[in-house]
Protein backbone atom coordinates (compact mmCIF):
# COMPACT_ATOMS: atom_id res chain seq x y z
CA UNK A 1 0.00 0.00 0.00
CA UNK A 2 1.95 3.05 -1.20
CA UNK A 3 1.27 6.22 0.76
CA UNK A 4 2.31 9.36 -1.07
CA UNK A 5 2.65 12.60 0.91
CA UNK A 6 2.51 15.86 -1.05
CA UNK A 7 3.24 19.18 0.62
CA UNK A 8 2.26 22.34 -1.23
CA UNK A 9 1.87 26.00 -0.50
CA UNK A 10 -1.80 26.91 -0.28
CA UNK A 11 -3.58 28.56 -3.17
CA UNK A 12 -4.47 25.85 -5.66
CA UNK A 13 -8.04 25.25 -6.74
CA UNK A 14 -9.98 22.14 -5.85
CA UNK A 15 -9.81 21.13 -9.51
CA UNK A 16 -6.00 21.41 -9.51
CA UNK A 17 -5.76 19.28 -6.36
CA UNK A 18 -8.12 16.70 -7.86
CA UNK A 19 -5.96 16.53 -11.01
CA UNK A 20 -2.83 16.21 -8.87
CA UNK A 21 -4.29 13.22 -7.03
CA UNK A 22 -5.24 11.58 -10.33
CA UNK A 23 -1.82 12.12 -11.91
CA UNK A 24 0.17 11.06 -8.83
CA UNK A 25 -1.95 7.93 -8.50
CA UNK A 26 -1.41 7.10 -12.17
CA UNK A 27 2.37 7.63 -11.91
CA UNK A 28 2.66 5.39 -8.84
CA UNK A 29 0.48 2.72 -10.43
CA UNK A 30 2.57 2.80 -13.63
CA UNK A 31 6.00 2.79 -11.98
CA UNK A 32 5.38 0.39 -9.10
CA UNK A 33 2.66 -1.87 -10.44
CA UNK A 34 0.55 -1.16 -7.36
CA UNK A 35 -3.20 -1.45 -7.77
CA UNK A 36 -4.65 2.08 -7.82
CA UNK A 37 -7.20 1.13 -5.16
CA UNK A 38 -4.27 0.56 -2.78
CA UNK A 39 -2.55 3.90 -3.46
CA UNK A 40 -3.08 6.61 -0.86
CA UNK A 41 -2.33 10.27 -1.59
CA UNK A 42 -2.17 12.74 1.30
CA UNK A 43 -2.05 16.44 0.44
CA UNK A 44 -0.90 18.92 3.05
CA UNK A 45 -1.35 22.58 2.18
CA UNK A 46 0.95 24.94 4.02
CA UNK A 47 0.25 28.57 4.75
CA UNK A 48 2.78 30.90 3.15
CA UNK A 49 3.64 32.35 6.56
CA UNK A 50 4.50 28.84 7.79
CA UNK A 51 7.10 28.14 5.09
CA UNK A 52 10.47 29.79 4.59
CA UNK A 53 13.46 29.44 2.29
CA UNK A 54 16.79 31.00 3.22
CA UNK A 55 15.28 32.55 6.33
CA UNK A 56 12.55 34.40 4.43
CA UNK A 57 8.91 33.40 4.74
CA UNK A 58 7.04 33.01 1.45
CA UNK A 59 4.42 35.45 2.75
CA UNK A 60 7.13 38.12 3.05
CA UNK A 61 8.29 37.87 -0.55
Swiss-Prot record:
Keywords associated with the record: Isomerase
Active-site residues from the entry: 2 (proton acceptor)
Any one Pfam family match given in the protein's UniProt record, by short name: Tautomerase
Enzyme Commission number: 5.3.2.-
Enzyme class of the recorded protein, top EC level: isomerase
GO molecular function, one term: isomerase activity
Family to which the UniProt record says this protein belongs: Belongs to the 4-oxalocrotonate tautomerase family.
NCBIfam families assigned to the protein according to its UniProt record, in alphabetical order: PRK02220.1, taut
Protein name from the UniProt record: Probable tautomerase SERP0934
Amino acid sequence: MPIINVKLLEGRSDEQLKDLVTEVTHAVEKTTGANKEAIHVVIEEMRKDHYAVGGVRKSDQ
